Amino acid sequence: MALAYIGLGSNLSDNVDGHIVAPRAQLNKALDSLSLHRHTSLVTVSSFYQTPPIGPGEQADYINAAAKLETKLTPLQLLDYLQSIEQQQGRVRTIRWGARTLDLDILLYN
């Protein structure tokens, strides 16, 4: 199994089935999705941190965290899975460095 470190961030709420999902809940939901994949094991998760945004316009602060995974997925397979989680949680890619419901990045792989 490979080790992978994932960066997580969110500064937008999303409306899911009539319920508002706040940024902290977005991260928890993404961590749940990561732990459910049969080829991925969630090893540990950092604390959550509130950080100011870098980018265009007025944006809310981000909630950020990092997670350590063990995975049998290749880097490309892992990236595809992370992007599918982002899409499931309402991520729309419009403005570079803009506000987002969820941002998942591979920080380090093996």
Feature map (PLM): residue ranges:
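Core catalytic alpha/beta fold that binds nucleotide/phospho-ligands
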Residues: M1-N110
